[in-house]
Amino acid sequence: MNTCSLSRLAAGVIALAIVFSASAAPGQGPVLPLPADDQQLIGAHLGTGVVGAARPCEPIVDASRYFPLQERDFTFQVTSGSHTGNSQTVSLKKARRPGGAVAWRFGFAPTLAGFITTTSGGDLLMTAVSDVHEGVIVFTTPANPFVLASIKPGESRSFKQKVSVNYLDDPTRRDWGGRLNATYTYVGSYEITVPAGTFDTILIRFAYRGKVGPADVVYTAWYFFAKDIGLVAMVNLEDVSAFWIYHVDTTIGKVLAVR
């Protein structure tokens, strides 16, 4: 092998070493491109220019960093759905329970709220969702995952749920129940630009399908969480084949308008 060939070989080895050391640098997790199907649906409901480049991502160690349980208001701009163009201000509130326990309620919309609890392992779970406009509360067993601690980038967790729909005017009355097949996925980390600013976020996709009474239910949600901020963008797509059971207008996109 001549001197020129040795030089080229040495240069190639050095280049590979640089690339490898960069990808293995401390604190640098995998970079997971946004899947094409997700990109298309998210873009259609959040608008162009909101989702930027994929970023290095890491396992979720402390779920509360991505959704801090502190009382505050969030102002979102609605980007798709029947209220497109409107602003909505919702709240994260806590309530005391016997024995000193704390319960949390987060408003996804002015009339739609999720009830959040923390497990001993640090997971944030949503135990129920209420819609005061329709006068119903929906329970799922096990509870819906919101932010899970220790889940890894690209990991999916699938599980089965029981669901019941109860009426606020008569909580003991349960006309409809059913079963769902759900999948919770840590899709990756992406730069997000919204009116409130530009953030590095993690993207969680939560999807389920099944039957509630005679209705076929298909639901997918995408949640973008920024550390120490919480939700900065979300898309909810719901398809219920029998709206006369109950109807929640959750086919919407929203972006954080005020930090």
Language model feature labels by segment:
Residues Q28-G121, S130, N166-R259:
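Acidic, serine/threonine-rich low-complexity disordered tracts
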Residues L112-D175:
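Extracellular-facing segments of soluble proteins and assemblies that are Gly/Ser/Thr-biased and enriched
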Residues I18, H45-T48, K160-K162:
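Short hydrophobic/aromatic-rich motifs at helix boundaries and adjacent loops
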Residues N2-V13:
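Bacterial N-terminal signal peptides that target proteins for export
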Residues A22-Q28:
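Signal peptide processing junction and immediate N-terminal pro/mature segment
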Residues A11-S21:
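Bacterial N-terminal signal peptides
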